[in-house]
A protein has these predicted regions:
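N-terminal accessory beta-strand-rich subdomains and adjacent acidic, glycine-rich linkers
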Residues: 1-218
Length: 218
């Protein structure tokens, strides 16, 4: 059905099974009937930066970047930009303007993460909105159960990032969102059956009505 997907392995061991990519917007469903263009662009990333408030203050980041262009019915829709280093994988979407349409509303992400069978979880359930101190929930860390089983969805509202998983005795998987600013909303992780987790946007009622649960891109 032309649905973009990806998978992640480390030393031939699966850590993320085949998982979907894509965006569903108010100008089109870009999660299916997509075509991968052949001109994949590859770049080497070599950056050094310093931060005073992290465990490793001096960071030398070396990665390979791959830019994968997707079209639909002959029109360029978006790039999925992956960066792969020795210890992490990151990706983001870059939308293209559609003729005179220079902005869109993202109604839903098709981004998903399918964990290997037997993985266990260390996840903080997200609270319902408009509760807690000054009605600021979900703004606090909640209790989590170590080595819990998959197939749950917290207290019904998913989980708050970062989300930690143990891939049996093979290693650990940390899923989080990074680099989010005021141009996009913060998200959560929604749990489903068979090791499937998907991106969820904010709940209705969060932030006392400030902001939106459907981010816009321009």
């Amino acid at each position: 059905n032309g649905q973009p997907s990806y998978r992640i392995s480390y030393k031939d061991t699966p850590f993320i099974n085949s998982s979907s990519l894509g965006l569903i917007t108010n100008i089109g469903d870009f999660s299916r009937e997509m075509s991968l263009e052949h001109d994949v662009q590859s770049n080497r990333i070599d950056e050094t930066y310093t931060l005073p408030n992290i465990k490793q203050s001096n960071v030398h980041y070396v990665a390979t970047e791959g830019v994968y262009r997707f079209s639909q019915q002959g029109k360029m829709i978006y790039d999925v930009i992956f960066r792969v280093s020795d210890r992490d994988v990151a990706f983001k979407y870059k939308m293209y303007p559609q003729k005179n349409t220079l902005s869109c509303i993202v109604k839903e992400e098709a981004t998903s993460f399918v964990l290997p069978d037997g993985s266990t979880t260390f996840l903080c359930p997200q609270s319902k909105p408009m509760g807690g101190f000054a009605r600021t929930s979900p703004s606090y860390e909640t209790p989590y159960k170590a080595d819990d089983t998959m197939g749950k969805n917290g207290w019904g509202e998913g989980y708050t990032f970062p989300c930690l998983f143990r891939n049996s005795d093979k290693g650990w998987i940390l899923i989080s969102e990074t680099g989010v600013d005021s141009k996009y909303c913060g998200s959560r992780l929604l749990g489903h059956e068979n090791g499937l987790y998907t991106i969820g946007f904010p709940q209705e009622g969060e932030m006392n009505g400030n902001g939106t649960t459907a981010p816009g891109l321009a």
